[in-house]
């Protein structure tokens, strides 16, 4: 597996590419100031409530679907593979259930009918299922909470780091750039883990990433999304295809602009094509990005 990885931060809209000088936009120097947040302001999923999809192997709490998530946990350790299926229309997300403590899973496909299913064994026999009419109060909510792939808990080191590195910033653009720079400057690409990831699915562990200061594309993206969400900046981890290989990257929501795609980045006061993560790996990528999954 070639040492390339795709953590992309994008800070412009209206363009899906920026390869020519005519595409350059002026930096929005008048972007509105906004107050920062503290440790006590971080959003965490709520596992209270009595709306439970219950089986002998796992439970799914859907009491807070209006906030854009469900929580799920194993009832006991299992030698069998246990999966949670979340489906809306033709789009399906399968998650491994591996924890006896409740973990959040996003309802990121918008309002409408969702199917939840608990499955067991290699053949994934259905244990319990439920169809829900989901109406999310704020469409950005699924991208403001931790979840299985962007997992942080109260007291985790990443929460204090994320708050500290933006404490002098006056607006979200400054916060986004400082978080981006922190991730790129402090994490080294892990070649051995990249090889391991070709053999099995590795869920990002943010505590280990912070401790070891190494990771692969999935880890870079998860860490950056976590730091943004901790600061109330909606962000989503995206997995998909590039011209090189399957990767993970980041999209961020900018007030007044919307979701920003991974082809544009801000460099010293102008909008221009830039990929500092590829740059840090000494790899110049100018290809396409095709999103498949959003987390």
Task: Identify the function of each model-found stretch.
Residues 148-212, 260, 268-295:
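Secondary-structure boundary elements
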Residues 219-295:
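Hydrophobic/aromatic-rich core segments of domains that either
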Residues 59-60, 194-199, 218-219:
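Short N-terminal helix-initiation segments at or just after the protein's N-terminus
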Residues 1-2:
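N-terminal hydrophobic targeting signals that begin at the initiator methionine
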Residues 175-179, 213-228:
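Active-site nucleophilic cysteine motif
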Residues 5-171, 260, 291-295:
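N-terminal accessory/pre-domain segments preceding catalytic cores
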């Amino acid at each position: 597996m070639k040492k390339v990885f795709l953590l992309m931060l994008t800070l412009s809209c209206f363009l899906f590419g920026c390869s020519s000088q005519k595409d350059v936009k002026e930096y929005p120097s008048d972007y509105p100031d906004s107050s920062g947040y503290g440790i006590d302001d971080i959003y965490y999923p709520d596992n209270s409530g009595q709306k439970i999809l219950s089986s002998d192997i796992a439970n799914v709490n859907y009491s807070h679907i209006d906030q854009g998530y469900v929580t799920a946990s194993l009832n006991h350790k299992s030698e069998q593979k246990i999966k949670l299926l979340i489906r809306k229309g033709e789009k399906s997300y399968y998650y491994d259930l591996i924890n006896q403590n409740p973990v959040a899973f996003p309802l990121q496909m918008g309002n409408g009918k969702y199917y939840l299913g608990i499955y067991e064994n290699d053949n994934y026999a259905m244990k319990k299922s439920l169809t829900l009419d989901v109406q999310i109060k704020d469409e950005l909510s699924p991208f403001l909470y931790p979840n299985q792939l962007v997992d942080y808990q109260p007291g985790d080191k990443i929460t204090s780091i994320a708050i500290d590195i933006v404490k002098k910033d006056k607006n979200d653009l400054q916060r986004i750039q400082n978080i981006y720079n922190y991730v790129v400057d402090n994490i080294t690409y892990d070649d051995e883990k990249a090889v391991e990831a070709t053999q099995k699915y590795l869920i990002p562990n943010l505590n280990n990433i912070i401790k070891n200061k190494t990771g692969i594309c999935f880890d870079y993206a998860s860490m950056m999304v976590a730091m943004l969400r901790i600061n109330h900046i909606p962000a989503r981890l995206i997995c998909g295809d590039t011209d090189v290989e399957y990767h993970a990257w980041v999209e961020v929501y900018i007030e007044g602009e919307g979701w920003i795609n991974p082809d544009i980045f801000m460099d010293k006061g102008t909008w221009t094509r830039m990929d500092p993560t590829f740059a840090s790996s000494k790899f110049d990528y100018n290809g396409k990005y095709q999103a498949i999954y959003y987390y």
